[in-house]
Amino acid sequence: MAVKIKLTRLGKIRNPQYRIIVADARTRRDGRAIEVIGRYHPKEEPSLIQIDSERAQYWLGVGAQPTEPVLALLKITGDWQKFKGLPGAEGTLKVKEPKPSKLDLFNAALAEAESGTTAAATTPKKKKAPKKDEAAEAPAEAAEAPAEAADAASES
């Protein structure tokens, strides 16, 4: 029986996601698989390529023929070079940086809040009210002084 390593398509329109499978060469594209050995998501940045290297090596060793797209993926992961005994078995696969967990982000923000900035606001508030009060107090004091003098004169 001729065995091929090929892709089966999953996902929505314009968002393809593939499984890398081992299947009989006569089965249709999304037909019955002998074994699923990986997955490929081309729309992610960088593309997600996960292949079970041990199982891929086994199937290549027993004569399974990869299709052209799968061959390209095997070269990226380094499995094809490993199978053929060529240099570059580490592959050229780019791995996405893991996102920090929400708990780590929360703890970092909490530590920053506890250790940090209890100073005044960065933008100083406008001090319009004291200027108006000083200007209003000066004429009021001037008006009170003659009135006090008049009160003192009338009491004596």
From Swiss-Prot:
Region Disordered, annotated ranges: 113-156
InterPro entries: Ribosomal_bS16, Ribosomal_bS16_CS, Ribosomal_bS16_dom_sf
Keywords: Ribonucleoprotein, Ribosomal protein
GO biological process: translation
Pfam family, one: Ribosomal_S16
Gene Ontology MF term list: structural constituent of ribosome
UniProt keyword Mitochondrion present: no
Name of the protein in question: Small ribosomal subunit protein bS16
Taxonomic source organism: Mycolicibacterium smegmatis (strain ATCC 700084 / mc(2)155)
